[in-house]
Amino acid sequence: GAVIKVRTSFQEITDTGIRTSEGKVDCKIFVDARGVSSLVQKDRTGILSSAQYEIYADWIKKGKVEVIFDQEKYPGFFAWIIPSNEGKGKVGVAGKGINVAEALDSILKEKGKFSTIRKIYAPIWIKGPIEKFVEGKTVIIGDAAGQAKPTTAGGIFTSGMGGVYAGQ
């Protein structure tokens, strides 16, 4: 069986498993799912800041996705408005070297009245999958392996293929 630890910091790989902030864990395979933060050490140039708000707004129309390409405002990426229903959706922005909170607030101010359901600020990886995601008894998955698709927040296919290769 698997052991899943949350609110626990990985510290190092040992001969019999790993050491965490809560002590040693014996394991045959260590799955690294630490997210984009583990890529920071490898290559900062592949990381963009992003902000996304889930909101209610009369100007969000069901079935009307907006993608805003403006390399001056959102260098290296874009802004988006994705409805989840009539009057409800996700509005976001990502870019290199910008204040994403200010950029998103500017979009929302232009669009009109809204009420916020939740706010998410997160780094996103844009350079694709890492070259080596299986090393010894460590398997790196998901965002930590660059297996997510930043344009859709997806990554089922790339993560699934990673699992197939790891199994081999």
Describe the predicted segments one by one.
Residues 2-118, 125, 129-134, 146-148:
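Predominantly flavin-linked oxidoreductase catalytic cores and closely associated redox partners
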Residues 155-168:
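An active-site-proximal "capping" alpha-helix that borders the catalytic cofactor pocket
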Residues 133-136, 158:
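A generic short alpha-helical patch detector that favors 3-5-residue windows
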Residues 138-140:
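Residue-level marker for buried hydrophobic side chains located in beta-strands
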Residues 145-157:
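Glycine-rich phosphate/pyrophosphate-binding beta-alpha loops
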